[in-house]
A protein has these predicted regions:
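Glycine-rich, acidic/polar active-site loops that bind/position phosphate-bearing ligands
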Residues: 1-204
Length: 204
């Protein structure tokens, strides 16, 4: 059973809507085992800033890669400008994606070319645990739907180029709670980091 939990204006359709749903068991109350959203401890005072990295892929390789081998080494692509660095359809796509997100009411904060050729990043800011998570998922969906018309795929895999020197992708997560913002203090943050450290390797 699908349970609507968030709704966004669909920028591709007049008077259309995009509806985020949770998957529930037939009783309509029990979350399905695949329903990770239902496990989130919602906190409206928690703020999140997501930095989603990804690759554009075309014909089985990152956009801008030659048919054989690799492009020029990493370095000038990061926040790059100019045809040799980002001179393909990527910039057009990321700008259009930004506009689509804003039209859908998603708090899209920015874009930049990343370290590897064909790799980009967008940033989403949200207040509230579930609301922030919903926004990043919907932003991903809009990006993948957008690139269909360009004949391009999106690759979110952490190391799509395997064991090479080429950069991988991740999603940095910046966060704060009301207590962190209003009280904070060195002792509190040291205690917080100590708790994170206990499960460091599990997260990695």
């Amino acid at each position: 059973v699908l349970k609507p939990v968030a709704i966004y204006p669909d920028p591709a359709r007049t008077n259309g809507a995009l509806v985020m749903c949770e998957v529930m068991m037939p009783d309509g109350v029990t979350p399905h085992p695949s329903n990770a959203r239902a496990t989130i401890l919602d906190d409206e005072d928690a703020w999140f800033g997501f930095e989603q990295e990804y690759f554009f892929y075309q014909n089985g390789r990152p956009l801008g890669f030659p048919e054989q081998g690799y492009p020029a080494p990493q370095g000038p692509y990061y926040t790059g400008v100019g045809y040799s660095n980002v001179g393909d359809v990527a910039r057009e796509i990321v700008e259009e994606h930004l506009d689509l997100c804003l039209a859908a009411g998603i708090n899209h904060e920015g874009i930049n070319a990343e370290v590897a050729k064909g790799q980009w990043e967008f940033q989403i800011f949200g207040k509230g645990s579930k609301k922030a998570a919903d926004q990043i998922w919907m932003a991903r969906y809009l990006l993948q739907r957008l690139t269909e018309k360009y004949g391009i795929d999106i690759e979110y895999h952490c190391k799509p180029l395997g064991d090479t020197d080429w950069n991988g992708s991740g999603m940095h997560c910046n966060f704060s709670t009301k207590y962190m913002r209003e009280v904070g203090g060195k002792a509190y943050f040291e205690a917080l980091m100590a708790q994170f450290e206990k499960n460091l390797m599990d997260h990695i």
